[in-house]
Curated annotation (Swiss-Prot):
The lineage of its organism: Eukaryota, Fungi, Dikarya, Basidiomycota, Agaricomycotina. One of its GO terms (molecular function) is cutinase activity. Keywords: Disulfide bond, Hydrolase, Pyrrolidone carboxylic acid, Signal. GO terms for cellular component: extracellular region. InterPro entries: AB_hydrolase_fold, Cutinase/axe, Cutinase_monf. It comes from Coprinopsis cinerea (Inky cap fungus). This is Cutinase CUT1. It catalyses: cutin + H2O = cutin monomers. The 2 disulfide bonds play a critical role in holding the catalytic residues in juxta-position; reduction of the disulfide bridges results in the complete inactivation of the enzyme.
């Protein structure tokens, strides 16, 4: 009887000391400091592709000292999507990722990025974001961007970094693949430094 009473008192004391965790705190518990949502180019495999995604992911994690989540957007990346101006489903997915992260992790820095058709997807996603969610995007980075000359909505234009190589006709809006379009991997360290400077 005495043991039961003591155990009950001990459990009560522990419960009293443990502060209740609110729903918001629970959702924020697993937040990263930095999120990068990246869309690969046409025909690339996986969600990160091969030309830019893996190198950018590694470079960002090296350059940014805080915790980072680098996530590839799952979308078909078909030629038909590029010719249509970018895959709409992929853009919706990216926009939803931003909105959900902005709501769940109010202190996180959020970046969106894309290569080739992925850059188109990034532009389309930016247009789908509410003004409040656009304000939560810390920066936009694109490579081989067919929409290089198109302004991003709201204040995102001033938080934009675009890489377009000399001789890359995709950047000129022409559906012609030449060697300069496949060398953006060398720009990933610079892009990572640009991101790190804004964290």
């Amino acid at each position: 009887m005495k043991f039961t009473t003591l155990a009950t008192l001990a459990l009560g004391a522990v419960s009293a000391l443990a502060a209740p965790v609110t729903e918001l705190e629970s959702r924020q518990l697993f937040c990263r400091d930095v999120y990068v949502f990246f869309a690969r180019g046409t025909g690339e495999v996986g969600t990160l592709g091969t030309v830019v995604g893996p190198g950018l992911s590694a470079a960002v994690k090296l350059a940014v000292r805080d915790s980072v989540e680098f996530e590839g957007i799952d979308y078909p990346a078909l030629v038909s999507g590029y010719l249509a101006g970018g895959d709409r489903g992929g853009a919706r997915t990216m926009a939803n990722k931003v909105s959900q992260t902005a709501s769940r992790c109010p202190n996180a820095k959020i970046f969106i990025s894309g290569y080739s058709q992925g850059a188109q997807v990034t532009h389309l996603a930016a247009r789908q974001l509410s003004a409040a969610d656009q304000a939560r995007v810390t920066g936009v980075v694109t490579f081989g961007d067919p929409y290089r000359d198109d302004a991003l909505p709201g204040g995102l234009q001033s938080r934009r970094k675009t890489y377009c190589n000399v001789g890359d006709l995709i950047c000129a809006g022409l559906p012609t693949l030449l060697a300069p379009h496949f060398t953006y991997g060398s720009d990933t360290p610079d892009a990572a430094r640009w991101i790190a400077a804004r964290v």
